[in-house]
């Protein structure tokens, strides 16, 4: 499996290939090769800044002579009018890296900002907000980094770092007990140490899990707030609990107050708006 650094390098290479192709002809025809300049990153919307470290890598990979002065770091609260960084170098390099840097930082900052709003709603409870695998293909590591920068907690990264028995797995395996048994047999055979989470859709399935055991976390899928409270009481701390399914900004606090350990929110990554910012020439 690729490391985070390797994934970032591949992303940057692909992004430059699709964006510049055989050349930025607008810049090449208008800007002399030896022209030098300076641009700053202007924040145009309040939020949480994210993507600074990756932006630095974008500049360094495209043109190692570019000088980046970071004024505001990842995770900081920013407001309209703030200057997050100043970049000095060849004007051609400034122009050709502008859009990729903005695409990354706007996307990551939007996710961090959205996540932080959910985190703030959970203050005073023990509940942590989780992301999901509902991410942009190829950008999962970046988007999950942004969730962490915003104060959220990463769920599993992919299909390889946790067992998550969902409804289809259970149905195809012939029921909850069979599915759990097969997981333990597989993990033993492959000498793997992975946590097991199982999704339940109703109280009958919940009781089957409690009777069987052998899991680390129980996901309460599409339970109402009232049923969540009942389920948490029944589980009584024997397993970690996670609420999932249709939970929104307006309803998340109610679920957290029922005592669940985690709440997963797909909207952190699949329905987010980028944070407004621009990269402008300056003196």
Model features per residue range: what roles?
Residues 1-212, 217, 226-234, 239-242, ...:
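Acidic/glycine-rich phosphate/pyrophosphate-binding loops and surrounding catalytic core
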Residues 221-222, 245, 267-268:
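Short secondary-structure boundary segments
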Residues 249:
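Cys/His-rich Zn2+-binding cysteine-cluster or related metal-binding knuckle/ribbon modules and their
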Residues 278-283:
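Active-site loop ensemble at the mouth of alpha/beta enzyme cores that anchors a bound cofactor
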